Amino acid sequence: AILVAPDDGVVARLISKLVYLWRVQCEDRLASLWRAEESGQARDGDAFGGLVSRWLCVNGQVRKQKNGLVLTPQGRLNAEVIVRSHRLWETWLGRHVDLPVDHLHPPAEWIEHHLGEQVRKRIENELGNEDVDPHGSVIPREKK
């Protein structure tokens, strides 16, 4: 029973953890591609070989081109939510926690996968119309 209990069994928890890790990998890949586009960097031409990249392609988040992967419109929207969450959280931390700017990234890298729309809205309201994060990067606007 402890192994296969539907919600609290070892197997259920393992599956839940694997699903979470997969989602984080996919979101990180989307955000990475978005940041590459933002900075004008060359796309990773070998990126299509990875399982995550293939999954994103099959699910319509990215397309393969000669020079690598590009975000589809839906992939771009999803990536912007992740990058926006990250940069909003860095900005909030920069205002409220006594951390050097170079220490803001690691906690934001984790929390970006957990900020829901309601929490993002609360942070936005508290920050006002903040356009730039503490590193000087533009915070993407939310698309309606």
Ranges and model annotations:
Residues 1-32, 117-138:
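Membrane-interfacial segments at transmembrane helix termini in multi-pass membrane proteins
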Residues 33-37:
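Short helix-to-turn junction characteristic of helix-turn-helix DNA-binding domains
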Residues 39-144:
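Structured cytosolic domains appended to multi-pass membrane proteins
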